[in-house]
Structures are given as C-alpha cells and as structure tokens.
Amino acid sequence: MPEKLPEIVRNQPEDKPYLVTGRRIYVIGAQDGGFPQRGEHMPHEMWGIWLPPIKLFNGFWLWLEDDWIGKADRFVMEPFGCRFVYERKEIELERFQWAAHTRGAMALELTVRNLTQAPVQKSLALVIESNLMPVWLSERMGRKDGKDSVSCDLEKGLAAWKDQENPWSAVMICDQPLDAFELLEESRTGSGQRPCGSAGKACDRQGYKNENTSCCKVSFSARLAAGESKRFSFFFGGSVCSRQEAGEQAGALMENRQELLEEKRERYLELGGRASLSFAGEPVLEQMYRWNQFINDWIQCEIPGVGEGVVAGYAEFPWWFGNDTNYILPALLMQGEVAICKETLRLLRRASLKVNGNGRVIHEMSNNGVVFYEGMTTETPQFADCVWQIYCFEGDESFLEEMYDFCREGMRWIESVSEEGLPRGYGISEVAGLDCMCCDVAILAVRGYEVMSKMAKALGREADASCFEEKFCATWEIFHREFFIPETGFYGDMVAGREEIIKRAESWKHSLKSFPITPEDEIVGEASCKQDKSPRESKEKERLCRRMENVIRLAKETEPKSRRAYQLFGLGHSTIAVEFGYVTGKQARELLAAQEQWREKECFQIDGIMPLALGRRMQAYGYSREPEKILQVLRQTGEGFGAVMPGATSEIYPDRGCFVQGWNSFATMWPYFSVIFGVRPRAGQKELILQPCICPDMGKISLTGVMIAGRPFSFFLDFEEGRGRIRVEIPSAQWRVNLVWEEEQDGKPELVVEVCDAKA
C-alpha cells in the first residue's frame, strides 16, 4: 500500500472543471473557484452539486469584506477532494471540498490564516444558489421543477431549501453560528446578472435564466490573533424525500467529520495498492494509471430505488450505458471491484427486462431510471461478454448461472434481427443510416456466440455449448466472406444492397447526423444527442463528399439485388476482428497496415480520437505482435493526461467531451495486464494463460496486487541483454501459469513463477 496519496497542483487555475464525488453526491465546478453554468443534455445545468436524480445547488461563492473574493491563486486536486488557495491582504484562505463516501452530503471547509503579527478581523460570506430540479428525462415521469424556498436559523448556523412542488430538499449546517442572512433575489434576477459566475463574477448566461432558483448570502466573521488559523466548516446535505432527511445527512457528516474523512483517505490509499503499476522511465504513464485507479471509484454511483453501478462519465453522462460498461469493467476487475461490476450488470438487466423483455440490452438510462434508447444491436452481445469476463476473474459459477438465461435470450434476439446469420442495426458509431449490416454489429455478434458457448460449457450445458460453438464458427465464416474487401485488404464498414447504400450515401454527402433514437424530440436536451458529426473543416467536408460519390459509383456497378461491403468513413471497426484474436500474427499485421494506409490516403476524421479507440488499437497490436506500437500508443494516450482536469483524460483526445470518462481505463490501465503481460485469467480452473507482447524498449514494468479470485497476483517484466524475463507471483501452488508464444515470434521470454502466500 502506498504511504501517501498523490496530489496535482495548478497555479493560476482556469475555469476548467473539477470533480468531487461520493456514491450519492457529486460536485462539478471550476478550478478557479467558480461555478459556471454549463451543460448539453440539460443546457447550462450539468455542473453544480447533484444528488442524483436531482440537482441541489448551482454552486456557492466566497465573499471577503462585502465583495467577491475572485479567482483562486492555486488549485490542488486530491483523490478524495480538492483545495483552493486564495492569497489576500493579511490573510490566506484555503477552501477544502470533499464528499462523504456513502452519504448524500458534502463538506466545504474554509481555513482562514492570519499572515500578520497583529490581530485581524475579517468579514466573510458565502453566497449560495439552490437549484432543486430533476435530472434529464424526468419529464417522461411527469416530474416538474418548482420554485425553491429558503429559510435560515442564524443561531444554529443552518439554512434549508425546499422545492415548493416536490419534496426535494437541501440543508446547509455551519459548525458555528452565523452573523447574518440575506436573500439576493433582486441582484440575481433584476439586472440579468448574478453574483455567481466563474470565480464569483457576474455571469452572462446568453439569455438563459432559471426562475425557480433561490440565491442567498450567509455571513460570518473571522477574528484571528497574530499567526492564528481558524476553520469554518459547512456541511451540505440533500434528499429527494424530505427536509428532515436532508438535515440528517448534513448533520451526520458534521458529527462524524474526522472519522468519515479518514475513512475516505484510507479507502483511496488501499485502492492505490491494488493492481498498482510501476513503469521505469515513464512517470506520466505511471501517474495516469494511478489516477485512473481513483477514477474507477469516482464513477461508482448508488441511487435508492434505481440501483448502483458504474456510470459513463462527467459532466454529460453521470448515468448508465450498455456499451460503456463493456469497456469499464476490465480495469475494475483488476482492482477486485467484482461486486460493483455485478451490480452494474444487474441494473442493466432489470432495466432491459422492463423496457424490452426479450434479452435486448438497453443503450442509455438516466439516473432516474428512465431509459433513453432501447439498445444498440452491439450492446446485447457485449453484455454477455461482460458476464464472461467476471467469471474469468472470479471463477464463481453462481453469477454465471444467474445471468445465463438472460444472455441466451439476448442472443436469440440477435438472431431475430439477423439476415443470413448476421444482425442488422445500429452500433457504436451512431450515424443516421448506419444500420444495415455493420462491421462492429456483426463481429460483436460473432463474439456473443463465442462467449455463450464458453458459458454453457462452464455450466455443463453441453447441448447449448455445442449449438453456440457451431454458430460462432459459422458466423465468423460469414463475417469474413461478407465484409472482407480484397481491394483494400481489410474489412468494410457496412454490407448493404445497392438501393440501401445509394440513398444513405446521398444523405451522408451533406451531413452525418446522429441517428433519430426516439420520436420524443420535444423533450429538452434530447436534441443535443443528435449532433451532426460531419467534419468541421471545408477540406474535410469535400473529402467526405468525394468518398460518398465513390461509394455511390461502386453501388451503381453492382447488381440491383446483390449486396457488397463498403468502406465508408474509416471507422476502424475492421480492427475488432484482431482485438478478439480472430485474426493474429502476420495476417493481423497486414490487415492493420492496410487499414492505416487507407486512412492516410482516403479517410477523414468524423470525430476526435477517443482514448477508448487507442485502447482498442493496443488490443489489436497485442495480437498482431507489434509491441513497439503498443508503447507508442500508450505514450500518445499520456499526452492527453490532465489536459482538462488534473488526474483525468477526456472522452475525446486531448480535451473534448466528458472531462472524466470511465471507459478510458481501457487505454490507461487494461493494456498492461491484457496486452503487455497478455494475461488471460481462468479463475475457475485456477489457471493463468500468458500471451505477452513485449520489447526491450519497455524496460522494467511491474503490475502488483492484481485481484483474481479474491487473491493478489503480481507480474514483473525486465530485460537482460535484450532477452525478456517475466516473473509471476501467485498466492498458492494450486495455480498454474502457462506461457503461449507463437513459433514465428523471436525472443521468447523466460518465465519464472513464484508462490507468494500474501493475503488479499
């Protein structure tokens, strides 16, 4: 276990976001100390303080001597909270924010330090703007935002807010009496400007104004002797049920502050000791990996009445996705977070059964339990893949048994939307019209049949195992036959008939709109999910038009009722066959090289590069045996580390999309285990299969405390005179470790296995 937790300091911080979370509550504000109103799914509303499925506050702003304190001079990001430092005349103020791990409450602790050798007295205040409102898609539930009311008890140091149309409530408790309370309704709405923009400045919302909020100021005084420091603590609690419960949440945090804060620190110290990385000469990659260990905890959310699970990201996606889960779980499993992985899948299954009832897995569900879209075709086999991964790490058949029937029904649904063995429908790219027989949809169905055959075999269901094995082999052959384009040397984006592709390509020449998921377009915020993904630059738009004209020309050359594979946008889905190990070695290298050459010549970027795509590329390089490229892509991923928020990588490289994205661990953590060491855990058989992809440039790498079957395993790589050596520490002699090394490969590493009976 590491001796202390890391921190990242930003001097003269900007209004870029930060995140502070617990399982029940989270805070998104600006690193300069303010709370700008930003968001897409709910315009202007995705930042602030949230207690899903409701928002509590737009934010709070510190005042000093009847004026806004201004921007922070320093911002410090810690795994369990964050600090803002304000250096002002005679005093220094440190603002520390953290959220309780499991309670619906957070703390704002203000330490005032007298920097002089004489007594000082300062007047301080906190401006607080409530915004008790429901989360995205609440309109479908009939929930409407009401006007907030606020009251204050100065002696008790307490302020309370309630939505007048709903039981939603919030309470703030200060650990000492307050001097004064003032409503700021007039200054908030009268001039069109508010004392609550970034770092306390008046804020222009470009015409946006929520009339249901309530803005107030609570004042207090700091009397300090020479060199003295004094702490003022404010505890915020919320509830979807009552003011009483909100007060109880805040009060419990105040009463147990030291214990709960220490508990949170210890939790993150312990997290840092599980599946920890050491990579000689690569401090950025080490740091990025370590912070992603903490992010894996930040994305865990529990909502009474809905469920618990890992959410996709902040600020735009603090809820659940079928697709994202498939890429988030692997790194969590490395850290031993099996329970939350299972709960996430149970949550998705419950929602899917309620909405679909046929094994189809949902795509997206808001944290109020409302499902936005019933599911991409890819997400059903991905769910089965998740179940199988958990079994591989845990080895317990009970969860496999629990999920088996649902997964089997899901693959039956896949068959119901299939044509000649392969399914039609939307995949991960979300471009309107990309719904014929798509590459990612088809190959993930192949993967679904493969994992179902393995599941059935593990459970002793031999007939099912044989049936799914036959379908796996048959669909792989169909996929290769239908999608492989000899002229390019790799698999196409989509297989379609002549008329299908012509009408789509005519539309794609002009725009790449996200597909119309639901007819309920009138719901506020849903339009943001239908953005045009067309290239922004005119030259790229011209390339798109020329590409589609070529597609139309090819289509017109085919027979009217025949179909063929088309390379459309260079989506990169061709690599999935390599990622799963269906194409390996020399053949994989040739396929990846051909795809890269085509992209350089023909392709345009319809969106920014995602770290997820880089992670998937590393999986492919593992099977194509190109370790130098793995190292290159790892370093490329590291270039986006901290571009927006210290400690995090963004959804889209380097600084776009969600500033904290759960599935980025597929690029920042998972490749060390699954690609470099190439570990394939088989916990049920107490066996590890190693299929490493290494090169001398990697130097020394260690991955210690990886949790498999509830016990720690450690992996060490080094090189001596160019030859690799892999040492594996196993917790018991009952485990077997087998090294797989293809004959065509040079430089087979030495494998050393040691029993190290350390307790988890």
Predicted regions and their residues:
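Short secondary-structure capping/junction motifs at helix and strand boundaries
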Residues: 118-123, 244, 341-342, 394-404
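Active-site core of glycosidic bond-cleaving carbohydrate-active enzymes
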Residues: 318-342, 346-353, 405, 430-432, ...
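Generic structural signal for well-ordered, non-membrane alpha-helices
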Residues: 232, 381, 385, 412, ...
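A glycine-rich phosphate-binding loop feature that marks nucleotide/adenosyl-phosphate handling sites
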Residues: 471, 495-497, 652-654, 687-695
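Terminal accessory carbohydrate-recognition/targeting modules of carbohydrate-active enzymes
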Residues: 1-280, 626, 630, 634, ...
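Substrate-binding groove/exosite segments of carbohydrate-active enzymes
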Residues: 207-215, 266-392, 397-400, 427, ...
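Active-site acid/base region of carbohydrate-active enzymes
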Residues: 163-169, 175-188, 274, 279-297, ...
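Short, mixed-charge aromatic SLiMs
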Residues: 350-359, 409-416, 474-478, 597-608, ...
